[in-house]
Amino acid sequence: MAGHSQFKNIMHRKGRQDAVRSKLFSKLAREITVAAKMGLPDPNMNARLRAAILAARAENMPKDNIERAIKKASGADMENYDEIRYEGYGPGGVAVIVEALTDNRNRTASEVRSYFTKSGGNLAETGAVSFMFDRLGAIEFDAAKVNADDLLEAAIEAGADDVNSSEETHEVVCAVESLAEVQKALEAKFGEPRKAGLVWRPQNTIAVDDETGEKLMRLVETLEDNDDVQNVTANFELSEALMAKLSA
């Protein structure tokens, strides 16, 4: 499993214990507002907004918060956010992609650079590591509600490339340009997915020792804790022992 997915699994469990929902809701709301401003405020006519709302629902964000974020897009006091992708190397030479929505490019760049430097890594130029990743569409369904074999058959028929299953979820993977069509076909058969959107997926992962793994997890956690950072993806793989330790 790639470091990014492992990190998400670990933080999902920790998040419930630490009750750090307000920061997460703030990031989800920002994406909803930006998506609504860039297109129509109707999720049925705006794929990015629909994806943002699905992500918010998956984290149990209150409906009022979601509606408020959509309405904010039409307000005169709506801040202007820039979408920026940072790329760099973390401890052990691991490739890291950071996606941000910021109202101050200089501030965010300075903060992200300092995180990389303090971790023993370095921030590089855009394009420095993204060639090591594939940009894909991903649609996630609850494993308890959707049969894996039925989903695989329907997904391939709809034009998807593969389905990755775990105990909790089934993830349908497809080409970026096929996402809307595949999602529509699967929703008609299985109902609304937990999540749907574009992801970065490492072509290969690097197995790191536990010391390096802990340093990388601290870097990713620090990046995720920044208000402007929306997503962090990396190409490392942790040992099962370290995963268990970090999840405890």
From Swiss-Prot:
Q: Name the keywords, alphabetized.
A: Cytoplasm, DNA-binding, Transcription, Transcription regulation
DNA-binding as a keyword?
Answer: yes
Subcellular location(s) per record: Cytoplasm
- Signal peptide interval: none
User: Per UniProt, what is one GO molecular function of this protein?
Assistant: DNA binding
List the record's Gene Ontology CC terms alphabetically.
cytosol
Please classify the protein's predominant subcellular localization into one broad category. Answer: cytoplasm
Query: What Gene Ontology terms for biological process does this UniProt record contain?
Result: regulation of DNA-templated transcription
From which domain of life does this come? Bacteria
Name the SUPFAM superfamilies for this protein: YebC-like
One Pfam assignment: TACO1_YebC_N
Query: Is Cell cycle among this UniProt entry's keywords?
Result: no
Task: Give the InterPro entries listed for this entry.
Answer: Integrase-like_N, TACO1_YebC-like_2nd/3rd_dom, TACO1_YebC_N, Transcrip_reg_TACO1-like, Transcrip_reg_TACO1-like_dom3, YebC-like
The text of the family note is: Belongs to the TACO1 family.
Protein name from the UniProt record: Probable transcriptional regulatory protein AZC_0510
Species of origin: Azorhizobium caulinodans (strain ATCC 43989 / DSM 5975 / JCM 20966 / LMG 6465 / NBRC 14845 / NCIMB 13405 / ORS 571)
From which lineage does this chain's organism come?
Bacteria, Pseudomonadati, Pseudomonadota, Alphaproteobacteria, Hyphomicrobiales
